[in-house]
């Protein structure tokens, strides 16, 4: 079975549920990557989030390396590396090494959000909270140069030229993408001639306007002579719409907790969420899930096709947000796997 139009990819935050270890959560995510590979999905990316009880995706390049070794065909990478948290040379070296491990299969998705709270942000950044954000465009250019065969050229105070490369003898380079959910990110991607991902899974407004800005201002680059767009979305698919709603409840409540400032917890099981109704939290969770695609296979496939066609995107990246029942194995995510399988089957049959 192979994905046709729209091209589908996988975004994974490596969710952690109650009683699950980080090792088990990573094992479940690697199995999900194998499923995506088997289904013919185009790429799997790992997000960067820190100090969150329900998310184990703290290091995209490490997870991408594991996924590359666990799969055979699918592209792997970051969705994304939050660049203000890292030195450009470090990022370039990490992804050049990944490209050497899995040539022609590596993506470097770059974002500028902190990926955590101000305390963790300060711990991650050695040069001050604001300075790296201010230099974000320059740092992207630096990374692209460092990844190239020629590397980057620095001019020392002595006037001497100093050349830096991310790896001694690269045979190929990762594909660089810019992630965002604002006009700023869209215009920057256009100016740099980079593929653009609108982070629709955050529920941010302005999708249509951002894509319009990107396409109208796009400056062709050698690697990308025409604009390339991707749209992310949270998706839960089950055999029935009712079961999809149940599967969506734990993560929707987790998102609602995050947005309302409540203490963050490991993701509840479906039974625990159903057994502990909370009018305020459940109303907020319903509002969160209303921005997702939560449905039976045929209806979910139709909505994805409509979104892709309406916005003219080249690719749709799915964040499968299905929760787990208490008796399901800790080292697997049957609900998330089923979301991918059912959706690909429905899209292929349409």
Regions found by a protein language model. Give the residues of each.
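N-terminal beta1-alpha1-beta2 module of alpha/beta enzyme domains
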Residues: 1-74, 337-345
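Acidic (Asp/Glu)-rich catalytic clusters
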Residues: 2-4, 37-38, 65-73, 95, ...
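An alpha-helical appendage that flanks or caps ligand/catalytic pockets
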Residues: 2-4, 129-165, 206-314
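Flexible, glycine-rich active-site loops centered on histidine and acidic residues
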Residues: 4-22, 84-151, 196, 335
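Hydrophobic faces of well-ordered beta-strands that scaffold small-molecule active sites
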Residues: 8-12, 44-46, 76-79, 106-110, ...
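Active-site mouth loops of central-metabolism enzymes
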Residues: 12-27, 79-89, 170-180, 238, ...
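Glycine-rich, proline-tolerant flexible connector loops at the mouths of alpha/beta enzymes
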Residues: 43-63, 82, 202, 320-332
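A conserved active-site cap/scaffold subdomain adjacent to cofactor or substrate pockets
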Residues: 182-205, 210-211
């Amino acid at each position: 079975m192979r994905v046709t139009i729209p091209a589908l990819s996988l975004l994974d935050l490596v969710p952690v549920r109650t009683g699950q270890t980080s090792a088990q959560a990573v094992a479940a995510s690697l199995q999900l990557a194998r499923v995506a590979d088997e289904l013919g999905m185009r790429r799997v990316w790992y997000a960067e989030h820190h100090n969150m009880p329900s998310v184990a995706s703290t290091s995209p390049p490490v997870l991408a390396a594991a996924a590359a070794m666990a799969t055979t065909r699918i592209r792997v990478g970051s969705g994304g590396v939050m660049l203000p948290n890292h030195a450009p040379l470090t990022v370039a070296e990490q992804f050049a090494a990944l490209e050497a491990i899995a040539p022609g299969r590596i993506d470097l998705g770059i974002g500028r959000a902190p990926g955590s709270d101000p305390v963790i942000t300060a711990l991650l950044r050695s040069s001050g909270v604001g300075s790296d954000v201010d230099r974000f465009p320059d740092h992207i250019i630096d990374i692209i140069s460092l990844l190239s065969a020629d590397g980057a050229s620095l001019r020392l105070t002595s006037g001497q030229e100093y050349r830096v490369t991310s790896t001694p003898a690269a045979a190929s380079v990762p594909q660089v993408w810019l992630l965002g959910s604002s006009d700023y990110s869209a215009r920057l991607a256009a100016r740099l001639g980079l593929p653009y991902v609108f982070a629709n899974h955050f529920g941010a407004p302005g999708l249509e306007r951002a894509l319009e800005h990107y396409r109208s201002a796009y400056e062709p680059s050698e690697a990308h002579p025409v604009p390339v767009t991707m749209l992310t979305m949270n998706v839960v698919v089950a055999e029935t719409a009712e079961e999809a709603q149940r599967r969506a409840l734990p993560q929707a409540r987790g998102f609602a907790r995050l947005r309302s400032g409540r203490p963050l917890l490991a993701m509840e099981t479906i039974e625990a969420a159903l057994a502990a109704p909370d009018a305020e939290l459940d109303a907020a969770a319903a509002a969160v899930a209303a921005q997702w695609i939560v449905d039976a296979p045929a209806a979910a496939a139709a909505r994805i096709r409509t979104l892709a066609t309406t916005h003219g995107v080249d690719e749709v990246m799915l964040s499968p947000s299905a929760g787990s029942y208490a008796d399901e194995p800790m080292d697997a995510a049957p609900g998330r796997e089923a979301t991918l399988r059912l959706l690909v089957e429905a899209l292929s049959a349409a």
